[in-house]
Amino acid sequence: MSRLCLPASLSEEEVEALDRIVRRSRPLHKGDYLFRADDPMRQVFVLRSGALKSYLLDANGDEQVTGFVLPGEMLGLDAIGETRFCGYAVALETSLACAMDLEQLEDLSGRIPGLRHQLLHILSRGIHGEHEHIRRSRERAEQRLASFLLGLSMRYRQRGLSPDRFTLPMTRGEIGNYLDLTVETVSRLFTRYIQAGLIECHGREVRLLDRSGLCRMGGLEEHQEASTSRR
């Protein structure tokens, strides 16, 4: 299980040590919470299958989507140093996560350099993704959505899945919330991309037809796609 939950160059002995602290959580159905704000911060999680949405609530109780979690991705590390989670993680579809006790993981990472390096890499990538998201919030709407689709494509590729044909687990409203766009704007942009021959859509299934065109739309060179890949 640890090979999926926390990819790292570990020896067989180290993998076995990690496996001993990994446990599979109960299956989550659409709408079930993996954790909520103010839940005790005792574990970190890695999604094994399905998809999750992370979000915060503002002062008015309105939802602000902060990211989408795909299989093989970790969540909860950003709350390290806190005693409670500050946000929510909810299943967008039937999902399964594995959990690791935080104290045991910290102890193990102190004894396994490769594991410690991987955890630091995940934290660094998350911070970079947040900065990139803030930077892109100032861009035009068509750039934001193009970058979002390319980022999803890269994340699917990194997990050995098709980067050119995938199903969106989130609604267009949730995409709009994340990108700070109205659902009408998101729908209009999808129509524009389809008419331009950039993508093809059947329900929530998306097929990327012209990656170079999407990169131009997003203001990216093709080799820059990786910078859009973090949630």
Regions found by a protein language model. Give the residues of each.
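Cyclic nucleotide-binding regulatory module and flanking cytosolic helices
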Residues: 1-30, 74-75, 79-82
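Cyclic nucleotide-binding regulatory domains
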Residues: 6, 32-94
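Short aromatic/basic micro-patch
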Residues: 9, 25, 68, 99, ...
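Alpha-helix/helix-capping structural signal
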Residues: 49, 103-104, 173, 212
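Cyclic-nucleotide recognition modules
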Residues: 67-128
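Polybasic "coupling" helices that flank or enter modular domains
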Residues: 110-182
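Phosphate-/nucleic-acid-contacting segments
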Residues: 154-231
